[in-house]
Curated annotation (Swiss-Prot):
Pfam families: CagE_TrbE_VirB. The lineage of its organism: Bacteria, Pseudomonadati, Pseudomonadota, Alphaproteobacteria, Hyphomicrobiales. The keyword ATP-binding applies. ATP binds at residues 307-314. Keywords: ATP-binding, Conjugation, Nucleotide-binding, Plasmid. InterPro entries: AAA+_ATPase, CagE_TrbE_VirB_cntrl_dom, P-loop_NTPase, T4SS_component. GO terms for molecular function: ATP binding; ATP hydrolysis activity. PANTHER family: TYPE IV SECRETION SYSTEM PROTEIN CAGE, UNCHARACTERIZED PROTEIN YJGR-RELATED. Belongs to the TrbE/VirB4 family. It comes from the Bacteria. SMART domains: AAA. Disulfide bonds: none annotated. This is Probable conjugal transfer protein TrbE part 2.
């Protein structure tokens, strides 16, 4: 008998394995007292106890095999609202099935922010019994087709109940399906079980579930007189309690039962280059199932974020940067536009550089010395290529003579004390090169940025570069500065967990030099344990960039911001091109701006809500110009203690306790 049972279980597993991911509940062992004793915990017993009492915790098996004594250790009190121990029991019955169904018709229940148990009892009928039940139903409707007196006196009044005729036809179709054994029929009893120690809170939960079920076209009732029977009928193995059991077929059953679970993400960072058991990037809220967000899929953490302006992109980028600091020896390099990352950077002790802008705090303006590092052959080769780019940007056609002259001068400067651009110009022999580089020396408009004797950039673990002013300076000034910054960042990538955040990436996707650099980063930075996060509000620029296929393939994680125009012609095609289906586009279109985000990875997809509190929003969501001006003033006045005063200004009078400040 045991052999037959095990074979039957194995066959069921094999049948389900084709479409479902199932795992057998087992008894596991755990060593105690340094290995002197072994404790046994049974998952099946734990699940059955959860069904009965609503308490989900490990159940340790006793040494004596009297396991049933550990299942029901709570008292059940009958009534309109039954009680198990000190917790009230609520039952929501699903009835009034709609005329048609589709897969996952009740998946919206997954979004409810509460704990419940959904029981779907189905009592199978064999083919002959199902045909008999359906035949009785057919005869009942057949009798209603013609009026009673027409049937009694065998007359034809031409009065026909067309609804009854339709039901007869549908019943005959059901009989044909049962006879062909394409589907099986049975009695279906769905109920949702809730527990709560507060009666009013339980009633509110039950009413919320009832409203959601009714919104999907079903009927639903909160059980009262039938509550105890419905609860008992929901327990595993109980087939006789609860008389509410409509007859449906297995095709409808497959649509109604919850076959899919909500993707909760990995509790640990999936990247093998991170320390073992590193936590996920963040845990956020969404319905009753927490969501653990990770940028990485295996060892690739490149992420594409896109959505319209004003939908919460800057807040998301700031939160990603803040959460990334949880990893040991992490490095964060962010290219910001609009100073949205200023509050977080200063609060975290990072460096915030406003490149090309006026220094708001009266300090010496930032200036670079790109030729300061010429120690290795690779450094000198890069310097020569960088000088060549500057000359080409001024409209000079580069010839071999130009390259030889520039390379020769870079080599000479490697052993010289002066390494500014002015030193290079004074030493190079060709007049065309001198004239082209004049624009970038102290005598030209860009000398303030690129012609320093000593580099003012000291890169630490958290660096933010505000490039809004730089972006307005034109291509000839923008390209050299960003190319140099990219070079400095690349040299710091030593295998530590790193992330490069590019806000308003459409500005860079529109330039061939940066397109090539982004393409290169997406292909090679994975080996340096660095993730690239590209955020853009211009979907059309991303599509016209020429590397949309590279973005799609190299960025396995895509985070979409709410976009009410996602279903409109033109925008829809972009979402479809990067692999989104009709349902996903609908989710993006209906999501709440500045609150909900839709993440898609090869491992799953999820609409989530970051549910940020007021303290977090004070640093990742304070991007208004008035807020930024106050923060700059507070930082200038109080230095490292400015966050306390900032929070106090926003109504947190006990802010000092958050920072352990007396």
């Amino acid at each position: 008998m045991l052999f037959i049972f095990k074979n039957a279980i194995r066959e069921i597993e094999q049948y389900f394995a084709n479409t479902l991911s199932i795992r057998r509940m087992e008894t596991r062992e755990a060593a105690e007292r340094g290995g002197e004793r072994v404790a046994r915990y049974d998952e099946l017993l734990q699940f059955i106890r959860f069904c009965i009492t609503g308490e989900n915790h490990p159940i340790r098996l006793p040494a004596a095999p009297m396991y049933l004594d550990w299942i029901a250790t709570a008292e059940l009190e009958h009534g309109l609202t039954p009680k198990v121990e000190n917790r009230f029991l609520g039952v929501v019955a699903i009835d009034g099935l709609p005329a048609e169904s589709w897969p996952g018709i009740l998946n919206s229940l997954d979004l409810m922010p509460l704990t419940y148990r959904w029981s779907s009892r189905f009592i199978f009928l064999d083919a002959e019994e199902a045909r008999q039940k359906l035949e009785r139903t057919r005869k009942k409707w057949q009798q209603k087709v013609r009026p009673f007196f027409d049937q009694l006196f065998q007359t034809q009044s031409r009065s026909v109940d067309r609804d009854a005729m339709t039901m007869v036809a549908e019943t005959e179709d059901a009989i044909a399906q049962a006879s062909s054994q394409l589907v099986a029929y049975g009695y279906y009893t769905p109920v949702i079980i809730l527990f709560d120690s507060d009666r009013e809170a339980l009633q509110e939960k039950a009413e919320a579930i009832r409203r959601l079920i009714q919104a999907e076209g079903f009927g639903a009732r909160i059980e009262t007189l039938n509550a105890t029977e419905a609860y008992l009928g929901s327990l595993p193995g109980n087939w006789y309690c609860n008389i509410r059991e409509p007859l449906i077929n297995t095709s409808n059953l497959a649509d109604l039962i919850p076959l899919n679970s909500v993707w909760s993400g990995s509790p640990v960072a999936p990247c093998p280059f991170y320390p073992p058991n590193s936590p996920s990037l963040m845990q956020v809220a969404s319905g009753s199932t927490p969501f653990r967000l990770n940028l990485h899929v295996d060892d690739v953490g490149h992420t594409l974020i896109f959505g319209p302006t004003g939908s919460g992109k800057s807040t998301l980028l700031a939160l990603i940067a803040a959460q990334f600091r949880r990893y040991d020896r992490s490095q964060i390099f962010a290219f910001d536009k609009g100073s949205a990352l200023l509050p977080l950077t200063l609060a975290a002790g990072g460096d915030h550089y406003e490149i090309g802008g006026d220094n708001a705090e009266g300090r010496k303006a930032l200036a670079f010395c790109p030729l300061s590092d010429l120690e290795s052959d690779a450094d000198r080769a890069w310097a020569a290529e960088w000088i060549e780019m500057l000359v080409a940007l001024q409209g000079v056609t580069i010839t071999p003579d130009h390259r030889n002259a520039m390379s020769r001068q870079v080599t000479l400067m490697a052993s010289a004390p002066g390494r500014s651009l002015s030193d290079f110009v004074s030493g190079v022999q060709m007049r065309e090169i001198k004239d082209a580089l004049h624009h970038y020396t102290v005598d030209g408009p860009m000398g303030q940025l690129l012609d320093a004797e000593h580099d003012g950039l000291s890169l630490g673990a958290f660096q933010t570069f505000e490039i809004e002013q730089l972006m307005n300076m034109g291509e000839r000034n923008l390209v050299p500065v960003l190319t140099y910054l990219f070079r400095r960042i690349e040299k710091l990538l030593d295998g530590s967990p790193s992330v490069i955040v590019l806000d308003e990436a459409w500005l860079m996707l529109g330039h061939p030099v940066f397109r090539a650099k982004i393409r290169e980063w997406l292909k090679v930075l994975r080996k340096a344990n660095c993730a690239v996060v590209l955020a853009t509000q211009s979907i059309s620029d991303a599509e016209r960039s020429g590397i949309i296929d590279v973005l799609k393939e190299s960025c396995p994680t895509k985070i979409c911001l709410p976009n009410g125009a996602a279903r409109e012609p033109g925008t829809r095609e972009f979402y479809e091109r990067i692999g989104f289906n009709e349902r996903q586009i609908e989710i993006i279109s209906n999501a709440t701006p500045k609150r909900e985000y839709y993440v898609v990875t090869p491992e799953g997809r999820r609409l989530f809500d970051m549910a940020l509190g007021p303290v977090a929003l004070s640093f990742v969501g304070a991007s208004g110009k008035e807020d930024l001006n106050r923060i700059r003033t507070l930082h200038s006045e109080y230095d490292r203690d400015w966050p306390v005063h900032w929070l106090q200004m926003r109504g947190f009078h006990d802010a000092a306790s958050l920072f352990n400040v007396e």
